[in-house]
């Protein structure tokens, strides 16, 4: 889900706190406390959710673990702060969390007015619609007059209004502040349609009483580039978070996996040796403020991008989401990482 721009007054006040939080070096603060504090969803299956024992798992959670692996060489050195759509930005601005990894859309307002840095996109998504099969609806263009469940304070809510206005359709919004309330209302039949990011619809469908009775319509009505965010003002930390994501993507392209990473250190390919820190003259890790084997530690800790995708939300998961745009650039998608050299 995606929060609207906070009011100017609140944003300005919190930005002042955020600027102070970013004035210190985030990396040194993280090392001093011994863990990365990561903001995640309160519970979205496949992306971030605790199990019965309270252990967090999911696509966004694995990115938090990847950052911890880059910094400490240990994916367990991370603590999670569950945040809802409204709390997430304040938590990041205030310094309560070090990085936000919570299915959050990169927009111009968030990148500028809120004082965040987004990069790179870890999941290309778009807003969709879920309906009951019994409605016999095949397209979102057939939804005029429908009651639509949506979370307030989100760009989902704004996109919905724009789409129906553009297509001269009428609808009745059924709005709730918290995601569990939206889920319960749709499951109870208080609305005909549920709208949010399409990946979220796949996840939320699993929680319904009768998941097989619901379908996701083909229309994607928005661009939702999702990825981690950090506070502006600390370029080193921004680089570490960014290159952690790029390392995951590059590793998949190189064919480096969690199982073969040590073996690949002996590859004759100088790009791979440089990437894994086994090239004797490499300074790539130290330039980031990390050890030269930081990328190897990331892959040891969580695997490559493809492994993370498949086990959490792909064909190896209950969601079974196709890679689509999130396939590598040379395999029909648009996931692309700059070279490590």
From Swiss-Prot:
Signal peptide span: 1-23
GO MF assignments: glutamate binding; L-leucine binding
UniProt subcellular location: Periplasm
UniProtKB keywords: Amino-acid transport, Periplasm, Signal, Transport
Disruption phenotype: Reduced uptake of amino acids Glu, Asp, Ala, Leu, Ile and Val by bacteroids that lack this gene and the genes braC and braC3 or braE and braF from another ABC uptake system of branched-chain amino acids. Pea plants inoculated with bacteroids of either triple mutant are defective in symbiosis; the plants are yellow, have increased numbers of small pale pink root nodules, dry weights similar to uninoculated control plants and 30% acetylene reduction compared to plants inoculated with wild-type bacteroids.
Function noted in UniProt: Part of the ABC transporter complex AapJQMP involved in uptake of L-amino acids. Affects the efflux of these amino acids as well. Essential for the development of bacteroids, the differentiated legume-symbiotic forms of this bacterium, and for the effective N(2) fixation by them.
Entry protein name: General L-amino acid-binding periplasmic protein AapJ
Lineage, top ranks: Bacteria, Pseudomonadati, Pseudomonadota, Alphaproteobacteria, Hyphomicrobiales
